[in-house]
């Protein structure tokens, strides 16, 4: 299955069924970004809405993710008008490595954000992911200690 401009009416119907007022959205604008996101996720056989969990203090949900042949892909779909940053996806990559005990130095990572008809793509430096992992671990230890002291 592939999402195309022909599916515009399905996108519009789904939005209307979910309470989005008709005049508020432009299905063509949404489809311009949504189609590549969906088609890439299908093409790369990615899992969607995947929870990445390190602890009760450090977790998130990736829109689309796959890990095959030591290649981690994380894709995010953005529909708003606020500026986007890759920081969230860097954190997701770090959470993935922590949860599945994967060394970022031993894998290739590709992060993509789909927004307003554009695809932003980065291949983060493993050292940056490692630094984020360390920060997550340290922050989690600190928060656990605080919670213990509150008891």
What are these regions (language model features)?
Residues 1-61:
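Metal-dependent nuclease catalytic cores that hydrolyze phosphodiester bonds in DNA/RNA
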Residues 4-5, 20-23, 27, 122-125, ...:
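Intrinsic-disorder-associated interaction segments
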Residues 15-18, 96, 136:
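Alpha-helix boundary/capping residues
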Residues 52-134:
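Nucleic-acid nuclease catalytic cores
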Residues 141-151:
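Accessory terminal regions of nucleic-acid processing enzymes
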């Amino acid at each position: 299955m592939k999402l195309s401009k022909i599916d515009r009416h399905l996108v519009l119907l789904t939005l209307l069924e979910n309470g989005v007022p008709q005049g508020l959205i432009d299905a063509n604008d949404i489809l311009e970004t949504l189609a590549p996101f969906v088609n890439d996720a299908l093409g790369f056989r990615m899992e969607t809405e995947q929870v990445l969990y390190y602890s009760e203090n450090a977790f998130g949900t990736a829109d689309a993710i796959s890990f095959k042949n030591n290649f981690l892909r994380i894709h995010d779909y953005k529909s708003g008008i606020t500026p986007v940053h890759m920081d969230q996806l860097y954190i997701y990559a770090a959470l993935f490595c922590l949860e599945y005990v994967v060394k970022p130095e031993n894998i290739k990572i590709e992060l993509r954000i789909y927004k307003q008809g554009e695809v932003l793509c980065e291949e983060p430096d493993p050292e940056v992911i490692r630094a984020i992992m360390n920060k997550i671990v340290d922050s989690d230890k600190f928060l656990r200690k605080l919670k213990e002291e509150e008891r």
